[in-house]
Amino acid sequence: MVCYGVTIILVGTLGSLLVGAFPQVTPKKSCSLSKYQFPAPLELKAVWRMKEQFEDIMLLTNRKCNTRLFHRKWDIAELSVPDRITLVEAELDLTITVLTNPTTQRLAETCQQPLAFLTQVQEDLRDCLALEAPSHQPSGKLRHWLQKLKTAKKKETAGCLEASAILHIFQVLNDLRCAAQREDCT
């Protein structure tokens, strides 16, 4: 009887030691951006309201901006899938920064829902890049655009960056749609 009890304890102890000796295979987190091919109408409506309100605010201000960040000589469909994701993540980084620090209180109230949505998108994009292309190096086209963005962030006023990001928000969402379509984006 004592021998049987010791055997059970011994088997239990050895079993737990053996299980701990081998690394556990954790299931890979999947990268699914397909939900962003067609964002929820509620999210799009909130973004549309924010953009319209910003346009109304712009009419009342005297901003003179020449920022042409979102004017590119190439189309996003020309980029590889990791480049597309990197591009949209960078566009969202600027947009989220702008929406986090709006220049008017009126805009601050309207941008909360779009900000939450875009922040979630950015997290999903970063997860995908970390999972699928952790050591990805951007192509020459994208590298040039990223450098242009970095320079603009340093040289442009907050108001001009805000105008550029918000007025081109639907271009960012179209770029997101292309990134979500992966190889099917043409």
UniProtKB/Swiss-Prot annotation:
Record-annotated disulphide pairs: C31-C128, C65-C160, C178-C185
Coiled coil keyword on record: no
Organism: Gallus gallus (Chicken)
Record-given protein name: Interferon lambda-3
Subcellular location: Secreted
This protein's UniProt keywords: Antiviral defense, Cytokine, Disulfide bond, Secreted, Signal
Listed GO CC annotations: extracellular space
Endpoints of the signal sequence: 1-21
Similarity comment: Belongs to the lambda interferon family.
TM helices/strands, residue ranges: none
GO biological process: antiviral innate immune response; cell surface receptor signaling pathway via JAK-STAT; defense response to virus; innate immune response; negative regulation of viral genome replication; nitric oxide production involved in inflammatory response; positive regulation of immune response
Gene Ontology molecular function: cytokine activity; signaling receptor binding
Function according to Swiss-Prot or TrEMBL: Cytokine which plays a critical role in the antiviral host defense, predominantly in the epithelial tissues. Acts as a ligand for the heterodimeric class II cytokine receptor composed of IL10RB and IFNLR1, and receptor engagement leads to the activation of the JAK/STAT signaling pathway resulting in the expression of IFN-stimulated genes (ISG), which mediate the antiviral state.
